[in-house]
Amino acid sequence: MTQRERQILKWIEENPLISQQELADKAGIARSSVAVHISNLMKQGHIAGKGYIVRTAPYVVVVGGVNLDIGGRPHGELVAADSNPGQVRMSLGGVGRNIAHNMALMGLDVRMLTAFGDDMNAQRIAASCGELGIDISQCLTVPGGATSTYLFITDGHGDMALAVSDMEIYEHVTPAFLAGRARLLQNAQLLVVDTNIPAQSIAWLAENIRLPIFADPVSTAKAEKLRPVLGKLHTLKPNRLEAELLSGVSITDAASLNAAADALLATACGGYSSVWGATGCSPPTTAGGYTCPAVPERW
């Protein structure tokens, strides 16, 4: 399904009686083009015949962070307490948003639950999500709030040296907010959660939503939020430091990595994938494990 087809299907889901001309006006394209898109959607099985009877397709819900990322990388070695010539870029990020982005690129139907501020950054993120086909219609906008912003600096090799995050907006992703979207959550195929949201909200999801839950710890400071619910997770994706924290095992080599994995799997967590930065990732499960090399980042 193309991005345009996702957009048209979303409008049809919102208003099954909408006309082709109305769809054309909303999309800024010719009515004949809309007819072609609708024909394609019917062939793909998303629309069942005339009258825009929409089939309920499987979808994924992501609950977590959506940020404006500001990153700096020096041309050479990073020098502390000094101005470093280098490159600065702004991009859309957030662990949850990044996961949703990649799933949308894979053609999955993705619904996002998060909190936005009432600012231009939120508008920029919303526009990007619309282009990607990520549904943010159930998200919360906080009047007067500031959309989450993440500022980071890497060393000359691209590995993060330090970061500052302004993410107070996520305190609004409360259990009450999630309970108001329980139907959306319960009807999904799986749930992805990151630890940018409050610990009590993660606990509420683990206790009340009967879905496979995939969790990203985000950072060592936030990973502790997952400790009480480890046994209710389908899959956990920590980096080395987060895996050490949650497993209690110091990871220095492949053997200690496997020991950490065994400790986490013993909690009844169904799967585990440890990310080793530039080295790649190692996803052991109860059925065994293997290592995937990392794809170099391009600046």
Regions found by a protein language model. Name each.
Residues 110, 136-137, 213, 272, ...:
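Hydrophobic anchor at the start of a short beta-strand
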Residues 93-111:
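Active-site alpha-helical elements of protease catalytic centers
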Residues 56-57, 75-87, 105-189:
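Conserved N-terminal subdomain of the carbohydrate kinase-like
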Residues 61, 111, 192, 214-215, ...:
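Structural detector of well-ordered beta-strand residues that form the stable sheet scaffold
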Residues 84-93, 291-299:
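Short pre-catalytic strand/loop immediately N-terminal to key active-site residues, enriched for Gly-Thr
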Residues 1-20, 26-32, 36-55, 222-223, ...:
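Conserved phosphate-binding/catalytic region of the ribokinase-like
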Residues 190-259, 280:
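Conserved beta-alpha-beta core of the PfkB/ribokinase-like small-molecule kinase fold
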Residues 39, 43-78:
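Positively charged, low-complexity intrinsically disordered leader regions
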